Regions:
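Positively charged n-region of N-terminal signal peptides that target proteins for export
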Residues: 1-4
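Functional surface patches built around histidine and acidic residues
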Residues: 20-267
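Bacterial N-terminal signal peptides
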Residues: 7-16
Length: 267
């Protein structure tokens, strides 16, 4: 009895080709198998992502061309750069590659390998792109996983941070605070000169100043959450600046938040 030989490899990072077409029948089959495993494990299903599929296609072509498994061939960018080049915003990414005679055999082998299984069942990932390229009756498979981020403008992100802050105050039976607008705070956020003592000197009436970075507006840092229970807090100002990750795709927003207590605020 002949046994199919399957080669697999995986890669994880916590950090211009034509657009990929709709998934082929084989790619759809593997996509469905992945989501079936996640559903059995009580996890969210992954969404198909054309950006990830585009990156996966480029790599599967190299797998087939070289008749070998690797996460980076000579002259090829690393995984996060390949995915970042598609303009996808994300904060974690991983990859499985496999060589197999058919989809089911490949999927079975991936699920038996701890590293590959961990990628397939990673609870933080929300998207996947798959590419399968056939050469000489062998399938060369790339699965690219990611936790993708919403595409906020700076204005949208700032408004969401403010809304989440005031929502947290309401949950503590506190009144929402007024928000003033000072373009200097955005400039400070974009400057990457994060010396808070220096900034406070140029902002009369400020009783507290925080500088931090976020990928999602709902993930307020603990130091900012402390102000949600401050009874004396009257106003605040927030400056937001998007710092793109360049080719790596790991984009984030820098935030400068100034707080004014009622007795100290000067109009």
């Amino acid at each position: 009895m002949n046994r199919a030989i399957v080669a697999i490899a995986c890669l994880v990072f916590l950090i211009a080709l034509p657009a990929h077409a709709a998934p082929s029948q084989r790619e759809q089959q593997l996509f469905d198998l992945v989501n079936h495993e996640r559903e059995k494990a009580g996890l969210n299903k992954l969404e198909w992502n054309d950006h990830l599929a585009e990156a996966a296609l480029a790599h599967s072509k190299l797998l087939a061309e070289n008749r070998d498994l690797s996460h980076q061939f000579s002259g090829e960018p690393i995984l996060q750069e390949r995915v970042g080049a598609t303009k996808l915003r994300f904060n974690s990414v991983a990859e499985n590659v496999a060589e197999s005679p058919d989809v089911v055999t490949a999927h079975t082998a991936l699920m038996k390998s701890p590293g590959h299984r961990a990628n397939i069942l990673h609870q933080d990932y929300n998207a996947i792109g798959i590419s399968i390229v056939e050469r000489d009756h062998t399938l060369f498979i790339t699965q690219d996983f990611a936790h993708t981020l919403a595409s906020y403008t700076e204005k949208q992100f700032r408004e969401s941070v403010i809304a989440n802050f005031n929502q947290a105050r309401r949950a503590r039976k506190m009144s929402p605070v007024d928000v003033i607008s000072d373009p200097h705070l955005r400039k400070a956020a974009c400057s990457q000169d994060m010396h808070t003592n220096k900034m406070i000197q140029n902002m009369p009436g400020v009783s507290g100043l925080l500088v931090f970075s976020l990928s999602e507006p709902g993930a307020l840092p603990d130091d900012m959450r402390k102000y949600t229970s401050d009874k004396t807090l009257q106003r605040m100002n927030i400056g937001v600046c998007l710092q793109t990750g360049g080719v790596t795709g790991f984009s984030k927003f820098w935030v400068v938040a100034a707080f004014y207590r009622s007795a100290e605020y000067n109009q």
